[in-house]
């Protein structure tokens, strides 16, 4: 472990303490030491300090627990020189500190990590907004919708039954808390809450949607439906034996109100107002050129009123649709829903794994955006590897007409990015060519010329994936890149001459980490339709994407619509869409009339 020692010793205790600590650690300041040490070594240091301790001795030891947090291990000597966390007091104030939450809301919690609900809601809303911004989605309304959905996604946790259950859950929980994949909900692990499980009581996301409908009753936001969809569907909808109370607002409202025994609806409303005021106060600390809470937050309608709107459908395609134009008109709204939901769930997961202390520090320091460092795309060596590949072909076949034609095609495709930026259109292109013409090499050179960091190569069938994997790992192509195959049956990463047969199965935490990920359309669609994998859509939105043999997707019911949603989402990145549709026989009607792409 890495530890830091702080000395607040006085008089003769100073040299005695220094002799001990100098023997075990590096002095990094007049009164500070740091070292890597074992548990046994740390015990030895403590015992030696105790042997020489006097009333003037005061030494604290802190362990570096995480990248952002240290923990007090022990104090030897005069404990009054430090506070209970081992911090040296230097001043005091009678003013309210920025993150001192009012008494009425500081005990309203979001999860078993003890995060205050106000802080949790703001953090999720802020990070959801930042995700949309980082993905370069050219739609300010989407970023605002993600923010509003984020700050309201768990507002239903004001439910008194949830707060009572959570309080008792925290009393009996150990320190190593693992949050469930589908969030924290009332369950029967605590005695006395059987009547408030999901079978008989609304889940917090259902109550959140109900309250949000009331809060935004007067909103003029043109994308209000994306907000409600993101709130309601940030958790999966549970299967209930009797769903009659939970498939409409009136039933959820009735179940919720009937559960209010000791606390009135007016009291819940007062708490809601207080939490939203907290969120506004926190938001002022994050004001900058890209984020202004006052411009993003709507005008709330605080008087509770039961909505007459239906619950948000997961997909809004109409069962009665018969004309192609009817389906096409629903593609963009579904794509918008996907993006808002992706941002809210991803932000929620990032925030929920933090300790309450870490979250509080992020908010005090105004550095919450750094929490996204692990999910945003890193720079890779892929472009260098592709350049070596292309140069190798030119050196091996210096006067090859085939190479010249392929480079010309790649250059024409790459130039579409500049044209799209000038025209403010989307950089989604179609590459048509007969089998054996080198479409794979053209696609790689196109990626190189458009600043590639990662490629997600989507195939209609596993057999196509395996063929592509074989080609890309050949010595002439990208033997040193991390080429990942990710299908239902095969999950491997090949690099530096490792063969398919000898490569081990990819560990779960390594999924989608390759420089090039070869996968099937069903795996990519899972990023849309499943709650567990929706955060993988962030990878999809950041990467260069190649849809290989995409014409095979068009006759597949449902898949063709999901495919269209994916393309629509990428188109929202405008010239940064970096998406290529590859086929020997592209379906011109589908491309032009469904995907709305100029196939020329």
How should each PLM-predicted stretch be described?
Residues 344, 478-529:
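Inter-Walker segment of RecA-like/P-loop motor cores
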Residues 442, 447-477, 483-491, 585-590:
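Conserved Walker A/P-loop ATP-binding site and its immediately adjacent core
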Residues 110-148, 158, 166-167, 171, ...:
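Alpha-helical phosphate/pyrophosphate-handling elements in metalloenzyme active cores
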Residues 389-430:
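Conserved pre-motif I regulatory segment
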Residues 422-447, 582-583:
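Walker A/P-loop
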Residues 1-92, 129, 212-392:
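N-terminal accessory nucleic-acid engagement/regulatory domains that precede
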Residues 453, 535-544, 549-600:
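Post-DEXD/H (motif II) to motif III coupling segment of the RecA-like Helicase ATP-binding lobe
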Residues 143-144, 423, 507-514, 530-543:
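Short basic/glycine-enriched coil/helix segment immediately N-terminal to the Walker B
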């Amino acid at each position: 472990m890495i530890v830091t020692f702080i000395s607040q010793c006085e008089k003769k205790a100073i040299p005695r303490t220094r002799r001990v600590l100098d023997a075990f650690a590096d002095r990094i300041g007049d009164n500070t030491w740091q070292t890597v040490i074992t548990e046994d070594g740390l015990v030895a240091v403590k015992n030696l300090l105790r042997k020489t301790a006097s009333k003037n001795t005061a030494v604290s030891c802190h362990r570096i627990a995480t990248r952002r947090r240290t923990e007090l291990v022990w104090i030897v000597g005069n404990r009054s020189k430090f506070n209970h966390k081992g911090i040296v007091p230097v001043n005091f104030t009678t003013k309210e500190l920025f993150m001192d939450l009012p008494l009425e809301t500081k005990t309203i919690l979001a999860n078993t990590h003890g995060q205050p609900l106000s802080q949790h809601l703001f953090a999720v809303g802020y990070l959801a907004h930042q995700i949309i911004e980082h993905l370069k989605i050219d739609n300010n309304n989407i970023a605002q919708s993600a923010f509003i959905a984020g700050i309201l996604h768990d507002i239903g946790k004001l439910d008194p039954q949830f707060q009572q259950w959570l309080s008792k859950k925290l009393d009996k929980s150990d320190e190593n808390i693992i949050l469930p994949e589908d969030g924290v909900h009332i369950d029967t692990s605590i005695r006395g809450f059987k009547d408030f499980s999901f079978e008989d009581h609304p889940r917090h996301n259902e109550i959140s949607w109900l309250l949000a409908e009331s809060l935004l009753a007067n909103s003029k936001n043109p994308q209000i439906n994306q907000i409600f969809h993101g709130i309601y569907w940030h958790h999966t909808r549970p299967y209930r034996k009797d769903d009659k109370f939970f498939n409409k607002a009136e039933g959820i409202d009735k179940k919720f109100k009937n559960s209010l025994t000791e606390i009135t609806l007016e009291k819940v409303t007062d708490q809601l107002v207080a939490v939203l005021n907290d969120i506004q106060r926190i938001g002022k600390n994050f004001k900058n050129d890209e984020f202004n809470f006052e411009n993003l937050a709507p005008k709330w309608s605080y008087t509770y009123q039961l909505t007459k709107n239906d619950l948000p459908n997961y997909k809004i395609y109409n069962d009665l649709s018969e004309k192609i134009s009817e389906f096409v008109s629903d593609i963009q709204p579904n794509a918008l829903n996907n993006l808002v939901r992706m941002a809210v769930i991803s932000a929620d997961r990032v925030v929920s794994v933090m300790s309450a202390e870490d979250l509080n520090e992020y908010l005090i320091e105004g550095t919450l955006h750094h929490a996204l460092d692990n999910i945003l795309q890193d720079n890779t060596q892929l472009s260098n590897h592709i350049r070596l590949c292309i140069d190798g072909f030119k050196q091996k076949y210096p006067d090859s007409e085939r190479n010249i034609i392929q480079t010309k095609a790649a250059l024409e495709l790459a130039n579409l990015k500049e044209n799209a930026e000038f025209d403010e259109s989307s950089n989604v292109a179609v590459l048509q060519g007969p089998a054996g013409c080198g479409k794979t090499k053209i696609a790689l050179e196109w990626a190189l010329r458009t600043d590639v960091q990662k490629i997600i190569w989507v195939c209609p069938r596993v057999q196509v994936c395996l063929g592509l994997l074989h080609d890309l790992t050949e010595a002439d192509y990208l033997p040193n890149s991390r080429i990942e195959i990710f299908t239902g049956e095969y999950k491997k990463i090949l690099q530096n001459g490792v063969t398919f047969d000898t490569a081990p199965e990819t560990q779960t935490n390594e999924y989608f980490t390759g420089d090039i990920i070869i996968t099937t359309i069903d795996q990519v669609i899972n990023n849309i339709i499943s709650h567990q994998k929706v955060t993988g859509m962030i990878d999809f939105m950041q990467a260069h994407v190649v849809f290989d043999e995409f014409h095979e997707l068009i006759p597949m019911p449902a898949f063709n619509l999901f495919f269209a949603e994916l393309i629509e989402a990428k188109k929202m990145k405008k010239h940064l869409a970096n998406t290529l549709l590859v086929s020997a026989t592209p379906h011109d009607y589908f491309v032009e009339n469904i995907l709305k792409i100029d196939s020329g």
